[in-house]
Amino acid sequence: MNGFGAAVVITGCGSATPAQFLSNEELSQIVETSDEWIKSRTGIGKRHLADRSVSLSQLAAQAAIKALEMAQVSPRDIDLILLATSTPDDLFGSAAQVQSQIGANRAIAFDLTAACSGFLVGLVTATQFIRTGTYRNVLVIGADVLSRWVDWNDRATCVLFGDGAGAVVCQANDTKDNILGFELHSDGSQNGSLNLAYEGEELPLKQGIRVQKGTYKPLRMNGREVYRFAVAKVPEVIEKALYRANLTTSDIDWLVLHQANQRIMDAVSERLKLPPEKVISNLSEYGNTSAASIPLALDEAVRSGKVKKGDIIASSGFGAGLTWGGIIFRWGD
């Protein structure tokens, strides 16, 4: 047990991606690049992209319904919905739209924004709500449609991102606590390495008051700095989470990292001395889906039979902010 109130188990997962995709070969007709250039630097083969008729909340709702079905939980029994996203349909948030679409009428719903670390932050937040006894059934969703926020003329960024959603159901349990340990960090001094900033011209309203009138600019990233940051911080934060769980790397059955870049995942697993066969990767199929990437990879691994009940999973999210974190959990109830 955890020394708090209720214990926490993850009882279901689900994911959703758009049917349409853009291959590296097709992308090379849009911007100066090639399949070999992209794969050798990122490991990405294609990315699924949401049509303009598909909303972020629709993808999130599809993933949520699948997770609820696996958990055998009715939407009406959900107490809280946490939507981790940086690309909501509405700047005020999309969680309430998801709540309505899935029929979770009792649930309070709100967005969390922590970029590619968002799902992990949401999972930790859900754990704390359950452990304090506030809620018993929490739906955590990671979803992003970054295809709408990249510069499709910038080959350094447009080759990386895809759209998708993933979700898990967290429930209170009287005996088992399957959230074993976690560690979260932020460093705002490095915000310039990866951001999606609001910029514009000033608009004077009266003497002494000049507001900014503008819009959000496309995503900007310093790839080399993000790589250095991830390779240095991710192994460290996973080891800290393992320490909190009273475990070591030898106890890890699967490593489920934010699917940012295959080079990063390879470097992290090497530093943790984990064999490649323990690393779950679907980067080639989907690219970087930001907050969706961890639950999307987890869901595919569970449904394929790779991840089994009782397996210990180490996971880490890292990205804009800069934010990063690690969590250790046991799969299944």
From Swiss-Prot:
Active site location: 116, 258, 288
What HAMAP family does the entry give?
FabH
Gene3D superfamilies per the UniProt record, alphabetical: 3.40.47.10
Present the record's domain note. Answer: The last Arg residue of the ACP-binding site is essential for the weak association between ACP/AcpP and FabH.
Spell out the CDD domains in the cross-references: KAS_III (cd00830)
Task: Give the PANTHER family listed for this entry.
Answer: 3-OXOACYL-[ACYL-CARRIER-PROTEIN] SYNTHASE, BETA-KETOACYL-[ACYL-CARRIER-PROTEIN] SYNTHASE III, CHLOROPLASTIC
Cross-referenced SUPFAM superfamilies: Thiolase-like (SSF53901)
Which keywords label this protein?
Answer: Acyltransferase, Cytoplasm, Fatty acid biosynthesis, Fatty acid metabolism, Lipid biosynthesis, Lipid metabolism, Multifunctional enzyme, Transferase
Q: Where is this region: ACP-binding?
A: 259-263
The UniProt subunit note reads as follows: Homodimer.
Name of the protein described by the UniProt record: Beta-ketoacyl-[acyl-carrier-protein] synthase III
Q: Does the keyword Lipid metabolism apply?
A: yes
What Gene Ontology molecular-function terms does this entry list?
Answer: 3-oxoacyl-[acyl-carrier-protein] synthase activity; beta-ketoacyl-acyl-carrier-protein synthase III activity
What function does the entry list?
Catalyzes the condensation reaction of fatty acid synthesis by the addition to an acyl acceptor of two carbons from malonyl-ACP. Catalyzes the first condensation reaction which initiates fatty acid synthesis and may therefore play a role in governing the total rate of fatty acid production. Possesses both acetoacetyl-ACP synthase and acetyl transacylase activities. Its substrate specificity determines the biosynthesis of branched-chain and/or straight-chain of fatty acids.
| GO BP term, example | fatty acid biosynthetic process
One matching Pfam family is ACP_syn_III
Cystine crosslinks: none
Tell me the name of the encoding gene. Answer: fabH
> What pathway does this protein act in?
Lipid metabolism; fatty acid biosynthesis
Q: What is its EC number?
A: 2.3.1.180
Q: Which family does it belong to?
A: Belongs to the thiolase-like superfamily. FabH family.
Any one annotated GO CC term: cytoplasm
In which broad location class does this protein mainly occur, judging by the first location in its UniProt entry? Answer: cytoplasm
Which reaction equations make up its catalytic activity? malonyl-[ACP] + acetyl-CoA + H(+) = 3-oxobutanoyl-[ACP] + CO2 + CoA
Q: Quote the subcellular location field of this record.
A: Cytoplasm
Is DNA-binding found in the keyword set? no
